[in-house]
């Protein structure tokens, strides 16, 4: 194992980048960068049936969008390639042959039906299902007989008996497994493709991976991988298994859970900021010292400490994600947020597909109005409904405000002044409201609340003069005149 910190993120190109996998990649990235090490991306693409045509491209594209720059991968060979498992068979095969020659592995000719029957019988007896070793000591004659029947063998690793496999997990502490609870396991499938636990151990060794940091659903894989290291006399890497991510019901985040968007692509499409998502994901199962929760990527790299990875499940808090993204939204210049929001405004037919300069100017004013409130760029559409839809029926509280005895006088004065106002801009609108206040003697909530309710149908919202400007003179006058 190398003295240099070398970690890997090893996705399968079977789907889009999931939040859980993004967290695995992010923690590996922070760990590597904190120690001036290497962040490697390896593609585990041996499951051809499940691989998606654009699965690999999607992984790289979304990692890059998040700001996770890799040091080595299919596009950056640093002498440890190939970086796709499907291209490493020439590395695996001599090692498979070596294990067979040393009797550390053997061919198993049992059919899927026979294995399933064994499994069902074990479950019926209340036993933990595991392979019983029926083909562990076949004679040459028996092997020839099975092959004459056309049976394709898998290759199983011969698990040493009465042995304890222990490792010091950087998150969980010491973890031990009794080898007697692990049946001889398949290292090469009947189609000749190495299994995950065999290939990953080989790849980690030859790529000189120093630390394997992954989700704790991989804990049970670790003893099998250690067996491979020991079989070849290699030193295993250090292991760290991160806690699960759970939903509001404290259940493991499932891809079937419709309450939470779980793919990076979905957050991109909604108009979340990559640095905000990076920040949020970095706090899923890891915590800094102190109370601060907003950090740049560079700050995270500097303060990252693997000892602060949590043993407890990480709660995916949608409200917190919205808050974090809002913090970043407020820091951005309006033009950046507008460019993020523009596709959403066009998709909702609120701005033409080929907008004029006037349309764009209006859109920028709309964003400036709501930027401090927006949780994500796409939220501009529901936030700004009052600009495009008919006024909703007023609620009871709004009705009380608009029925105030001062309202007819207020609306008459305001309507008259706004009708004559040019230019119809927020600074002039603000002056006009002050003039109405002086002329009528109506002030405070008695002044502002009825105006807001009359033009927006809401009790609260952004700056009133700015809102009136963005609504436009025609719409504002139409809404005011019914209350004169």
UniProtKB/Swiss-Prot annotation:
<dbReference type="InterPro" id="IPR008925">
    <property type="entry name" value="aa_tRNA-synth_I_cd-bd_sf"/>
</dbReference>
<dbReference type="GO" id="GO:0004818">
    <property type="term" value="F:glutamate-tRNA ligase activity"/>
</dbReference>
<dbReference type="InterPro" id="IPR014729">
    <property type="entry name" value="Rossmann-like_a/b/a_fold"/>
</dbReference>
<comment type="function">
    <text>Catalyzes the attachment of glutamate to tRNA(Glu) in a two-step reaction: glutamate is first activated by ATP to form Glu-AMP and then transferred to the acceptor end of tRNA(Glu).</text>
</comment>
<dbReference type="InterPro" id="IPR049940">
    <property type="entry name" value="GluQ/Sye"/>
</dbReference>
<comment type="subunit">
    <text>Monomer.</text>
</comment>
<dbReference type="GO" id="GO:0008270">
    <property type="term" value="F:zinc ion binding"/>
</dbReference>
<keyword id="KW-0963">Cytoplasm</keyword>
<dbReference type="GO" id="GO:0000049">
    <property type="term" value="F:tRNA binding"/>
</dbReference>
<dbReference type="GO" id="GO:0006424">
    <property type="term" value="P:glutamyl-tRNA aminoacylation"/>
</dbReference>
<feature type="binding site">
    <location>
        <position position="255"/>
    </location>
    <ligand>
        <name>ATP</name>
    </ligand>
</feature>
<dbReference type="InterPro" id="IPR000924">
    <property type="entry name" value="Glu/Gln-tRNA-synth"/>
</dbReference>
<keyword id="KW-0436">Ligase</keyword>
<dbReference type="InterPro" id="IPR033910">
    <property type="entry name" value="GluRS_core"/>
</dbReference>
<keyword id="KW-0030">Aminoacyl-tRNA synthetase</keyword>
<dbReference type="Pfam" id="PF19269">
    <property type="entry name" value="Anticodon_2"/>
</dbReference>
<dbReference type="InterPro" id="IPR001412">
    <property type="entry name" value="aa-tRNA-synth_I_CS"/>
</dbReference>
<dbReference type="InterPro" id="IPR045462">
    <property type="entry name" value="aa-tRNA-synth_I_cd-bd"/>
</dbReference>
<dbReference type="InterPro" id="IPR020058">
    <property type="entry name" value="Glu/Gln-tRNA-synth_Ib_cat-dom"/>
</dbReference>
<dbReference type="InterPro" id="IPR020751">
    <property type="entry name" value="aa-tRNA-synth_I_codon-bd_sub2"/>
</dbReference>
<protein>
    <recommendedName>
        <fullName>Glutamate--tRNA ligase</fullName>
        <ecNumber>6.1.1.17</ecNumber>
    </recommendedName>
</protein>
<dbReference type="GO" id="GO:0005524">
    <property type="term" value="F:ATP binding"/>
</dbReference>
<feature type="short sequence motif" description="'HIGH' region">
    <location>
        <begin position="11"/>
        <end position="21"/>
    </location>
</feature>
<dbReference type="InterPro" id="IPR004527">
    <property type="entry name" value="Glu-tRNA-ligase_bac/mito"/>
</dbReference>
<dbReference type="Pfam" id="PF00749">
    <property type="entry name" value="tRNA-synt_1c"/>
</dbReference>
<keyword id="KW-0067">ATP-binding</keyword>
<keyword id="KW-0648">Protein biosynthesis</keyword>
<dbReference type="GO" id="GO:0005829">
    <property type="term" value="C:cytosol"/>
</dbReference>
<feature type="short sequence motif" description="'KMSKS' region">
    <location>
        <begin position="252"/>
        <end position="256"/>
    </location>
</feature>
<keyword id="KW-0547">Nucleotide-binding</keyword>
<comment type="similarity">
    <text>Belongs to the class-I aminoacyl-tRNA synthetase family. Glutamate--tRNA ligase type 1 subfamily.</text>
</comment>
